[in-house]
Amino acid sequence: MTRSATIVGSGPNGLAAALALARDGIHVTVLEAESEIGGGTRSHRPFTTVDLLVDHCAGFHPMAVGSPALAGLEQHGLTWRWPEIDCAHPLLDDAAALLHRSVNETAVGLGADGKRWKALFGQPSSSYDRLSADLLGPVVHLPRHPLLLARFGAPTALPAAVLSRAFATPQARALFVGAAAHAMRPLTEVFSSAIGVGILTAGHHNGWPVAEGGTAAISRAMHSALIELGATVQTSTRVASRADLPSSDITIFDTTPSVVADVLGQELTTRTRRSYNRFRHGPAAFKVDLAVRGGVPWTDPRVAQAGTVHVGGSAEDTVAAEAAVAAGRMPDRPFVLVGQQFVADPQRADGDVVPLYAYAHVPAGLDHDVTDVVIDRIEQFAPGLRSRIVETVTTSPQSFAGGNANFVGGDILCGTSSPTQLLLGPRPGRDPYRTGTPGFYLCSAATPPGPGAHGMAGLNAARRALDDLLKR
């Protein structure tokens, strides 16, 4: 008898879970509330005066390239493209910090901090193929490579603001803190180094590539593989109650924990239901997409070759901005993550007009327009930018939430990475994917290894579901 599975949500984790189950012979149905699959991996052409391809949310993929959840998708059209420089962090009145895939090349550019940078990232990045087996699963588990994991894990427990002080140069301090700021949390908290150490280690092994043809190429490839395996994908199909769920042997939610609590209700234990409803969401993103004629006039021209640009100023400026956001205040000089995907994937541009992707970290639910604040912040490091802007499109926290139910209040990470949630996940217990109710699982970015287009939470949840199915 053919077993069946229902996946609620078609973000990268939902699609990865669906793929893993379908490859095991399970008949899979994916239900997506929006009219388009992909969740945070969608891409679109939002401008009216020029034809530019823009990523909606996820844009750079140091954790996705090489992910077991995405294995084999090259056969379905997924192609990675790498920029000449992975990431740049411009500084006022000083040379920019440059991140290269090569640890050695990065270290050379960091001068006096080169040896320290290599000491922190050299060995873990060279061993990333083995290390990732532990990093891409639950935080609490029996490690496959305990010594490697211990060496990697020790610095991750430190506050990013503290670990950055191990470096002497403003470039190294800013480069590290900028990476840590991807966590969208106070950088003075314990474990706030974890995301920074993780993506820098992965990046030194994998680079920070983009998907050719937009991040949506990831979800398109996954969809193609699913259809080939006989799966069904239904869009514009919202699951709001238990009655909306078909009867299946396995049901996996690529949703917020609170949605699982709403849909399953009394089928969950009181403890799980309470934990899911208490799950905390973090700060928001305010996104500004710019059509720029002639490229961005960065003060340091090398920044123009970088796929990712961290506009945060000094390490101290970034720490202050993230602290303000966490406290509910809009900083005058926010941390802005800028994407120049077109340097690796030229088809995204339209002649000499290029798409500049930029999102600022802002307080959750911010309800006013900060477009000028974001542009002003970028222009501090690229004087004359405004005169080159052809068209502007903004995505507010409310717009993010309206187009993706997982982005509560504009939180594009699907939950705060506070120490408690980082270690315990959405509910107490050894397994963050099992809901405690047989046959039902959670696989969104609210579960380890967290945000990104890597799909590993989906693969991990599917593996749990298959293990449990064999025991029934």
Residue ranges, per PLM feature:
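Rossmann-like flavin
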Residues: 92-191
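N-terminal glycine-rich phosphate/pyrophosphate-binding loop and immediately adjacent elements
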Residues: 3-129
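Flavin-binding catalytic cores
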Residues: 116, 295-296, 329-331, 366-405
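A glycine-rich dinucleotide-binding beta-alpha-beta segment and adjacent secondary-structure elements
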Residues: 169-186, 333-337, 384-448
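Helical element adjacent to the flavin cofactor pocket in flavoenzyme catalytic cores
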Residues: 199-239
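A conserved FAD-binding loop/helix module that cradles the flavin
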Residues: 443-466
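Mid-domain catalytic core of redox enzymes
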Residues: 237-349
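Conserved FAD/dinucleotide-binding core of flavoprotein oxidoreductases
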Residues: 258-262, 291, 350-377
